[in-house]
Amino acid sequence: MKNLFILFLAMIFASILFIGCSTEDNPLAPTDPGNGGGDPDPIVIKTPRFMHIESISVTGFPQNKPNGDTWDWNPLSSEERKPDIEVVLQRSGNHLPVFWSDRRKNANHTSTYVFTKPASSDDGKLPYDVPYSQTWMISLVDDDFGGKDQMGSVSVKPSSIYVKDNATNFNKTLTSGSLKIKVKGAWIY
């Protein structure tokens, strides 16, 4: 009899628990999706205002010019005839550069070169804030005795690089043929 009474009380308790649950929204949480809770701080995906470029790295470039010639044509400037590389950051179109880097002499096409300093105080500086909705170019240039040779360029479009994850930093490698340029920095919201 005692066991029957305990079983009866357990059934009444279970019934009260099930009756207390409902499918109605919780009136204390009007944003409740109907599951009895609610996210007090829903995640909002932000759109950055700027791509804050802190450094530009060259991790690979063509060993020779498209016609097969070496980059340095003057054998007196370098026995190995390797390029003296610089990077240029500018808005796409016919815009003046906002950053022109210092030079790396006799660069090896498989080595990594990090650029953060300008060639002179008149050549801009990094970090630089690229507006989110604009397209920019980073060009690699060979500074020769006979002039500057364009070695290639990559397009930098922040809206194509951002992955809508509210990230703080970015580290993205952009490629064009055998040219590989890495941009590193932070998103500004």
Q: At which residue positions do the language-model features occur?
A:
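Surface-exposed coil/turn segments at beta-strand junctions on protein surfaces, enriched
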Residues: 46, 80, 129-133, 174-176
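Sec-dependent bacterial lipoprotein signal peptides
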Residues: 1-20
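Calcium-regulated, polybasic anionic-phospholipid
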Residues: 58-108
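Eukaryotic cytosolic "membrane-facing" regulatory regions
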Residues: 3, 21-30, 92-98, 127-135, ...
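C2 and C2-like phospholipid-binding beta-sandwich domains
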Residues: 68-78, 141-168, 181, 187
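Beta-strand-rich interaction surfaces with strong enrichment in secreted/lumenal proteins
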Residues: 102, 124-128, 170-171
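Eukaryotic beta-sheet cores, primarily in C2 and C2-like/PH beta-sandwich modules
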Residues: 87, 114-155
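Bacterial Sec-dependent N-terminal signal peptides
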Residues: 15-52
